[in-house]
Regions:
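Alpha-helical multipass membrane-protein architecture
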Residues: 1-580
Length: 580
């Protein structure tokens, strides 16, 4: 796609305007809770760029008509979506994975100011790395960065076609209202329990209710299922069947996992065993795919290495400043020696380069796999030190995730002719907003991580994964429960095969195989979540087949609204509970 020439567009006299920045920060603060909420529920988040663009242009169109405000231009909206998406992606800095995992393993809990500073430091490192990679990856090599392309096309459409913009915004807001209203009614007025399916599996001791096979009235899961696609949805269903329909009952029958109450859901009892094969499947597939991706893009990585040989003075100063910040904060909060933090920053730069390139070519950011690389590295460098293992991986994974998100935003800006340095400023302000809002929401949602996480209410699958890897690297194979070793071996073979197939087979064939990350997640979330996610994916696929034009135009907006409505009300209810 060719770059747009700013001189050809008289639509936006300003770019980095006060209203663009403030709008982005406010929307970022409002949308960040959605990703924190969904991250703790199912371990996934979604890009908020398009939602932020729609909401901003809708708000300023109203201000234009009612208050006489000047038109909100496309480049202004680009600054807005850059700040908002960077704020909402703050969960990659550890809020739904290594930070709660550290609490579960060591009891370490951080107050809001300290947690916000840590999350900001990790994320701003990713912003600095992205600033150094932009010219090579976007201008010289013109990597795709699919999310950035999609956002650019959306911005062009909504600023070029007023009716379509208004219709998509109304669809987004209507879905948000329905989802949020249902959540409010179910929590405050009418208690509608999950509809447990009757009966049991053939020859199985637990009932379907014990295994969590039920229909859940959650529109958030339906919406998220629509966003992740049919392949991931069906993979979740397959993973749920293997975990809760086969391995769970088998582990109970062999005495490897305890049975719960006869009329209850056995999630907490079974997940402590099931997470091991699930984590193995996810980690092995992710690392296999990651290694093959690196081999595929090795020429481009060599170009980045040559580029890094001569850092400009200003950029070198920024990188040194961020490194010093991380060393001070990591030492103060977690007792990490300076050399450990410096090594983590150096590793972050290398892995963020890889993450940005893989994301640029495939649209997938391998944050989880990169975190595991660091955990394995520090398992050797600092054996037995759980804080070092988790928080250095937090640095690399968080920096890589924020870097990749920034590259997609910079791709959007390049296409529409925006100034990259202004986007970098917007990204930094968004990170600040996300750090303050995201940490506050996290602390309100789970004030007692040890008692609330890895439960049916808050499954926190990413926490389970990071915690399990840290336990094995710290305590050795003795941390693995009885009988799980054989299941892990089978999962490792499957993960190796699926991870390799995902990178080596033609795309049309790879899409027909299960998604290992999705199947692995199903091992550590309740079965009813997997069923709802699959249902959402099937509904979206059917709609796309029957009404392709309508689905393309409104599908993402409706699905995003379903996710946003329930999660925002869920966060609001948590604040209400805290306030008494």
């Amino acid at each position: 796609m060719e770059q747009d020439n700013p001189a050809d567009r008289p639509d936006s006299p300003g770019e980095f305007t006060a209203r663009a920045v403030v709008t982005g920060m406010l929307l970022g603060a409002a949308l960040t809770p959605c990703n924190v909420y969904s991250g703790l529920k199912i371990g996934w988040s979604f890009n908020m760029s398009i939602a932020a663009g729609l909401l901003a242009v809708g708000a300023w169109r109203l201000a234009e008509k009612g208050l006489g405000a000047r038109p909100f231009g496309m480049r202004e909206n680009n600054i807005n979506q850059t700040a908002a998406s960077s704020a909402a992606s703050i969960i990659s800095a550890g809020l739904v994975a290594p930070i709660p995992a550290l609490t579960l393993l060591t009891g370490t809990e951080l107050a809001w100011p300290a947690l916000a500073v840590w999350v900001f430091a990790v994320s701003i490192l990713g912003v600095v790395v992205a600033a150094g990679l932009r010219r090579q990856m976007i201008e010289h090599e013109n990597l795709a960065f699919p999310a950035g392309l999609a956002t650019a096309e959306t911005l062009k459409r909504i600023h070029g076609r007023g009716r379509e913009q208004g219709a998509r915004l109304r669809a987004l807001l209507a879905a948000t209202g329905v989802s949020g209203g249902l959540k409010l009614v179910l929590d405050l007025a009418v208690s509608v329990p999950r509809l447990a399916l009757p009966g049991s599996l053939p020859g199985a001791l637990p009932s379907l209710k014990n295994l969590g096979v039920a229909l859940d009235p959650s529109l958030l899961m339906i919406g998220f299922g629509a966003l992740i696609g049919l392949r991931a949805g069906l993979s979740l269903l397959l993973g749920a069947f293997l975990a809760w329909g086969v391995l769970g009952p088998w582990a109970v029958a062999r005495g490897w996992a305890e049975a719960g109450a006869a009329d209850g859901v056995w999630f907490s009892e079974l997940v402590t065993w099931l997470l091991w094969p699930g984590v193995t499947l996810t980690v092995v597939a992710a690392l296999t795919s990651f290694v093959l991706s690196v081999l595929k893009v090795r020429r481009g990585l060599a170009a980045e290495a040559r580029m890094g040989g001569g850092l400009r003075g200003g950029y070198a100063l920024a990188l040194a400043t961020v490194t010093a910040l991380i060393c001070v904060v990591a030492g103060s909060l977690f007792g990490l020696p300076v050399w450990v933090s410096v090594l983590a920053v150096a590793l972050s730069y290398v892995l963020a380069v890889i993450a940005a390139r893989v994301s640029g070519e495939t649209g997938v950011t391998p944050v989880g796999a990169l975190g595991k690389v660091t955990q394995l590295t520090y398992g050797v460098v600092t054996p037995g030190d759980m804080a070092a293992n988790l928080m250095t991986a937090n640095i690399t994974g968080g920096a890589a995730g924020q870097c990749a998100d920034m590259m997609h935003d910079l791709k959007t800006g390049w296409i529409i002719g925006a100034k990259p340095q202004l986007q970098i400023y917007a990204q930094a302000l968004g990170v600040l907003t996300g750090a303050l809002a995201g940490t506050a929401v996290y602390l309100v949602l789970v004030p007692d991580p040890a008692g609330m996480l890895m439960t049916p209410e808050w499954p926190a699958p990413a926490v389970a994964t990071w915690k399990a890897v840290a336990e094995v690297l710290s305590a050795g194979l003795g941390a693995i429960p009885d009988g799980a070793g054989a299941a892990m071996a089978v999962a490792a073979v499957l993960g190796l095969f699926l991870g390799a197939a995902d990178r080596m087979l033609p795309e049309h064939l790879a899409r027909r195989l299960p998604s290992a990350p999705a199947a692995g997640v199903a091992f550590v979330i309740p079965a009813w979540n997997s069923l709802s996610l699959c249902l959402g994916a099937v509904i979206a696929a059917a709609a796309a087949r029957c009404w392709p034009e309508l689905t393309e135009r409104y599908g993402t907006a409706v699905a995003a609204g379903l996710v946003a409505g329930e999660s925002l009300i869920g966060v609001a209810l948590a604040f209400r509970t805290m306030a008494g």
